From Swiss-Prot:
Topological region Extracellular: 78-85, 149-208, 259-284, 341-432, 496-508, 569-597
InterPro entries the UniProt entry points to: Na/ntran_symport (IPR000175), Neutral_aa_SLC6 (IPR002438), SNS_sf (IPR037272)
Residue segments, region Disordered: 1-38
Ranges in the topological domain labelled Cytoplasmic: 1-56, 107-127, 230-237, 306-319, 454-474, 530-547, 619-635
Protein family membership: Belongs to the sodium:neurotransmitter symporter (SNF) (TC 2.A.22) family. SLC6A20 subfamily.
Protein name stated in the entry: Sodium- and chloride-dependent transporter XTRP3B
Summary of the function given for this chain in its UniProt record: Does not show transporter activity with a range of tested amino acids including proline, glutamine, glutamic acid, leucine, alanine, histidine, glycine and arginine.
Topology in membrane: Multi-pass membrane protein
Transmembrane segments annotated in the record for this chain: 57-77, 86-106, 128-148, 209-229, 238-258, 285-305, 320-340, 433-453, 475-495, 509-529, 548-568, 598-618
Annotated localization: Apical cell membrane
Length: 635
């Protein structure tokens, strides 16, 4: 079998990179072909669109990278792995993994000036499958990710009500008390699971498409279409808004959060070091994973963005800026989250104590005001020793109130965004205002990520001469959004949230690790690190430092292999894959096994992208083999 490196494509002579003022002549852009009209009179080559300025490119990368993971996953990881201690593995992984791989993808896109499929096909025809795999992952991710924007829209619309609909439990059908499911859970959980999702007891009970979520999903996809319909022309304008607004809201929330009662409890919990967690391998694995996925590596979006740059753009500087801003935003949002979390935990803790005080006061006919938080434990011990029989009757109803246990409750994802935050917001003054700000921020973060994902899908399609010759850019964008919206209706069914979790957990993890591993190998060992270094020097005038070379050639690939082995073994050792189902009779989630057909869907999700790489390489090899045989036969 022929080595792929033997077929690494060399660009035509008139497309070879030339230093400024070199063979291309003064003003000739490096890497850009000379005027096609001179070579082929009467033929006008399609000019590739460009960003209006470098700031626009920087903002679109930030908007793509800084997403919901910064708001609802990073704080959870800090909570799980020692608060401030988690920053140690996080920053190390940023240096050895995040920055190098981000620079690699931006450099590839800027050098090849094509979307993910064309860029990797240019390096080697055997690598076309890498770009196709990125396209498949981005498509599958966009199918389910826009559902988050659907929920954000739903909550945003309901945020204008007074009182907020999740602040109190509804009455039962007889109007004799509160709804039983809501009483067993909480008003915020009830609104999420029953009013928003109308969730079924299991993934096997799909139910029908619900018109209200379906309408919100359609609106969400219409918004995405308006953002991406004209490519860089429309995307470049949108990012000024989607990048700046979340920071504006986060700053407002920080000021408000720090003034809330109990905020210091949350911040103390976050920054109190737990040194033993540094010895926990899962802390390092999750730090690497968070860096990897929060930057959007392997999805093709970064390559697509960079392909619209001037070849002389300083992509190394932009890679460093985006990496630092992304991580700084994650830390900043954690401070906001933990201040809110401290307020919620303190409120629940004090509410619990007040219920215990009321129970004991009524049960033992104590004088109002006699029992306080400061003397509660002392009085409880006195009552237990003086009235043992009566206290034993009351004891099962006395709740164990603990601020530490409230703070220890780790929640991520939709649970943090739509239950924990809403629990805190409902207890704030002018709660409608804070609710509108919060869900508008979630919507802009989600839209920023969707713009990037949409670009990752559309760029390879619009780069295709076959597709673009039949359909204008607006039609391609519309068809992609329409198809995504139609498939996304699955997530508006009663079992939709279970399918959302399945897609969220299994669509990208192994696939993206494999894609980025092949990318690093392709650049360093197929295209050639020295050749790529020469290209970068010709484009930007920068010499590649030893740091980038060592990271690309050795450290980052080994780290990715380690992550890949960990997740693969974790899936195998876990045995039967499980999911969290809502039990309305108990008012909390329960763990259930995925049915066989759901496991088949998981396998299909993973295989649909990962298998593109070997299958396309095999197909290319077979095609070349038969062409060579035909040439020999003809001779």
């Amino acid at each position: 079998m022929e080595s792929p490196s033997a077929h690494a494509v060399s660009l035509p002579e008139d497309e070879e990179l030339q230093p400024w003022g070199g063979a291309g002549g003064p003003g000739q852009h490096p890497g850009r072909p000379r005027s096609t009209e001179c070579a082929h009179p009467g033929v006008v080559e399609k000019v590739r669109p460009k960003w209006d300025n470098p700031l626009q490119f920087l903002l679109v990368c930030i908007s793509y990278a800084v997403g919901l993971g910064n708001v609802w996953r990073f704080p959870y990881l800090c909570q799980m792995y020692g608060g401030g201690n988690f920053l140690v593995p996080y920053i190390i992984m940023l240096i050895v993994e995040g920055m190098p791989l981000l620079y690699l993808e931006l450099a590839v896109g800027q050098r090849m000036r094509q979307g993910s499929i064309g860029a990797w096909r240019t390096i080697s025809p055997y690598l076309s499958g890498v770009g196709i795999a990125s396209l498949v992952v981005s498509f599958l991710a966009s199918v389910y990710f826009n559902v988050i924007n659907t929920w954000a829209l739903w909550y945003l619309f309901h945020s204008f009500q007074d009182p907020l609909p999740w602040s109190v439990c509804p009455l039962n059908s007889n109007h004799t008390g509160y709804d039983e499911e809501c009483e067993k859970a909480s008003s915020t959980q009830y609104f999420w699971y029953r009013k928003t999702l109308n969730i079924s007891p299991s993934i096997q009970e799909n139910g029908g498409v619900q018109w209200e979520p379906a309408l919100c999903l359609t609106l969400a996809w219409l918004m995405v279409y308006l953002c991406i319909l004209r490519g860089t022309e429309s995307t470049g304008k949108v990012v000024y808004f989607t990048t700046s607004l979340p920071y504006f809201v986060l700053i407002i929330y920080l000021v408000r959060g720090l003034t809330l009662h109990g905020a210091t409890n949350g911040l103390a919990y976050m920054f109190t070091p737990k040194i033993e967690q540094l010895a926990n391998p899962k802390a390092w694995i999750n730090a690497a994973t968070q860096i990897f996925f929060s930057l959007g590596l392997g999805c093709g979006g970064l390559i697509a963005f960079a392909s619209y740059n001037e070849p002389s753009n300083d992509c190394q500087k932009h890679a460093l800026i985006v990496s630092v801003i992304n991580s700084t935003t994650a830390i900043f949002s954690s401070i906001v989250t933990f201040s809110i979390y401290g307020f919620k935990a303190t409120f629940n803790y004090e509410n619990c104590l007040n219920k215990v005080i009321l129970l004991l006061t009524n049960s033992f006919d104590l004088e109002d005001g006699f029992l306080t938080v400061s003397n509660l434990e002392e009085v409880k011990n006195y009552l237990a020793s003086t009235y043992p029989n009566k206290y034993s009757e009351v004891f099962p109803h006395i709740r164990n109130c603990s601020l530490e246990s409230e703070l220890d409750t780790a929640v991520q994802g939709t649970g943090l965004a739509f239950i924990v935050y809403t629990e805190a917001i409902k207890n704030m003054e002018v709660s409608q205002l804070w609710s509108v700000l919060y869900f508008f921020m979630l919507l802009t973060l989600g839209m920023g990520s969707m713009v990037g994902t949409g670009t990752a899908i559309l760029t390879p399609l619009t780069d295709s001469k076959i597709i673009s010759s039949y359909l204008p850019k607006e039609a391609i964008s519309g068809l992609v959004c329409l198809l995504n919206c139609a498939i996304g209706m699955v997530f508006t069914m009663e079992a939709g949230n279970y399918w959302f979790d399945l897609f969220n957990d299994y669509t990208a993890t192994l696939s993206l690790l494999l894609i980025v591993l092949v990318e690093t190998i392709a650049v360093c060992y197929v295209y050639g690190l020295k050749r790529f270094e020469s290209d970068l020097r010709a484009m930007t005038g920068r010499t590649l430092s030893w740091y980038w070379k060592v990271m690309w050639a050795f450290v980052s690939p080994l780290l990715i292999v380690g992550l890949f082995i960990f997740y693969l073994s974790d899936y195998i050792l876990t045995g039967t894959l499980q999911y969290q189902a809502w039990d309305a009779t108990q008012g909390h989630v329960v763990t259930k096994d995925y049915p066989t057909y759901a496991l088949a869907v998981i396998g299909l999700l993973v295989a649909s992208s990962t298998m593109c790489i070997p299958l396309v390489a095999l197909g290319t090899f077979v095609t070349r083999h038969f062409k060579i045989r035909e040439q020999f036969s003809a001779a």
